[in-house]
A protein has these predicted regions:
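A conserved mid-protein helix/loop that constitutes part of the nucleotide-sugar donor-binding site
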Residues: 19-30, 192, 196-215, 223, ...
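Acidic anion/phosphate-binding donor-loop and adjacent secondary structure
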Residues: 68-72, 148-152, 160-161, 166-184, ...
C-alpha cells in the first residue's frame, strides 16, 4: 500500500512494440498514479517502451519474458513483487501470467494476479492452462465477444473469475497550433473528407475501402488513409489505389503524431475491419471526436456502435452505398456524430472503465 492507502500495481506490457494494448497499459498507469496508486512497469527489453513511458515517471524494469518457464524472469518477478510490496500484478497475455503466477508461488508475498484478455480466441484446455485458470484471480475481457469465444471451448474456470470491462480511452488532449487538415492536403472547403486511421494490415480492410472509393470516384470527396504497416503491404495499397484510378482521391498520410486532432477535422470515419476485433479502439476514437463512423459488425462493434452505422457485409458495394448516403447528407452526419460522442462520453467513458477496473483490484472475493 502507498502512503495514501492505495494499492501498488505492477503493470506488465505484453510486447516490445507499441500498439493498442501498450497504450491501454500506459493510460491506466497514468491514471493510477494520479489517483495515488503505486505503479511499477515491467516490459521486455524494448527501447520503444522505455522511450514512450519516460514521461510517466513510473519506474520501469525490463525482463527477458521470453518463455512462460523462464527461470530468470520468474525470479526477477518474485524479487520485484517483494521489493515494491505489490498488491496487484496486472498482465496482458498468458505467457506473462504464467511468470507472475510462478513468481507468486515462490514468494511469501501473495499479490492478486489479474489478466486482461485483448484477443478473440477460444480458451486452451490443456493441463497447464487449467492451472492458470484456477490460479489467476480474475480474467478481464475487453468485450462480451471476447468472453463468449473464450468460453466456447468449455475451459475449467470458475464463473466468478471472469468479467467483461469494455475498453476505453481517456478524453483526448487537443494540441494547440496544429496543422489545418484541408490546408495541408489542399482539400477544398466543401469536399467531404473520409478517413481511415490505424495500422495498415490486411485484416483492417483498407482494400475493401479502396474498392468502395473507386465506385464513388466521380463524387466530391477525399479519402485520407492514416497509419503505417509493413512496407511491402503499404506499397500494395498504393498500387491498388493507382490501379483503381484514385489519384487525387486517396491520400496516404503516413504516421500521424496527433490522431485526435486529425479525427476532429474529418467528416466521416471508416473502420472497415475484416478480422474479428476484441474491441476496436479506433472506432471509439472517432466516436469521441464526434464523427459519424462506419464500421463492420464482425467484431465487438455491435456492443457499442449504433446499428445504423454497422455493415453486416464487408463487400465494397454495400460500403459504397452507405458512404454515399452519409456523404450526401450533412444533417445525418452531424446526427450520427453527436450520438456517437454521447455514447462515448457516457457508457464508454474512461471514468466508467477506471471505476470498473479498480473495483476488480479491490475485490476480496
Amino acid at each position: 500500500m502507498t502512503e495514501r492507502g492505495k494499492q501498488t500495481v505492477v503493470q506488465v506490457f505484453a510486447s516490445a512494440g507499441w500498439g493498442g494494448g501498450e497504450q491501454y497499459v500506459y493510460d491506466l498507469a497514468e491514471r493510477l498514479q494520479r489517483e495515488g496508486y503505486g505503479v511499477q512497469l515491467v516490459s521486455r527489453e524494448s527501447e520503444v517502451i522505455r522511450r514512450k513511458t519516460a514521461s510517466l515517471g513510473c519506474p520501469l524494469v525490463q525482463f527477458p519474458l521470453r518463455s512462460r518457464f523462464g527461470l530468470r524472469s520468474i525470479l526477477k518477478m518474485k524479487r520485484l513483487i517483494e521489493s515494491v510490496e505489490a498488491d496487484i500484478v496486472h498482465t496482458h497475455q498468458f505467457k506473462d501470467t504464467f511468470i507472475a503466477l510462478f513468481a507468486r508461488a515462490l514468494s511469501d508475498r501473495k499479490p492478486k494476479v489479474i489478466l486482461t484478455r485483448h484477443l478473440v480466441r477460444p480458451a486452451k484446455r490443456n493441463f497447464l492452462y487449467s492451472y492458470l485458470y484456477r490460479r489467476t484471480d480474475r480474467i478481464v475481457f475487453v468485450s462480451e465477444l471476447a468472453r463468449r469465444v473464450f468460453l466456447s471451448s468449455s475451459p475449467k474456470i470458475a464463473a466468478r473469475s471472469v468479467t467483461v470491462i469494455h475498453n476505453s480511452i481517456p478524453p483526448c488532449r487537443l494540441q494547440t497550433g496544429g496543422v489545418v487538415l484541408r490546408q495541408r492536403y489542399g482539400i477544398p472547403p466543401d469536399t467531404v473528407v473520409v478517413a481511415y486511421a490505424g495500422r495498415l494490415h490486411p485484416e483492417k480492410g483498407v482494400e475493401v475501402l479502396l474498392d468502395a472509393a473507386a465506385l464513388l470516384k466521380s463524387e466530391d470527396f477525399v479519402l485520407l488513409v492514416a497509419g503505417q504497416g509493413e512496407p511491402v503491404y503499404e506499397q500494395r495499397l498504393r498500387d491498388r489505389a493507382k490501379a483503381l484510378g484514385l489519384d487525387g482521391k486517396v491520400v496516404f498520410t503516413g504516421f500521424l503524431d496527433d490522431v485526435p486532432q486529425f479525427m476532429r477535422q474529418v467528416d466521416i470515419g471508416v473502420v472497415p475491419t475484416v478480422g474479428q476485433e476484441a474491441f476496436g479502439l479506433t472506432v471509439l476514437e472517432f466516436m469521441q471526436a464526434g464523427r459519424a463512423v462506419i464500421t463492420t459488425d464482425n467484431g465487438a462493434q455491435p456492443e457499442f456502435v449504433a446499428s445504423g452505422t454497422l455493415l453486416k457485409d464487408k463487400r465494397d458495394e454495400l460500403m459504397k452505398q452507405f458512404l454515399e448516403i452519409v456523404r450526401r447528407n450533412r444533417e445525418l452526419r452531424e446526427l450520427l456524430g453527436a450520438a456517437a460522442r454521447k455514447k462515448a462520453e457516457e457508457a464508454l467513458s474512461y471514468e466508467h472503465f477506471f471505476r470498473e477496473i479498480t473495483a476488480v483490484y479491490r475485490d476480496r472475493s
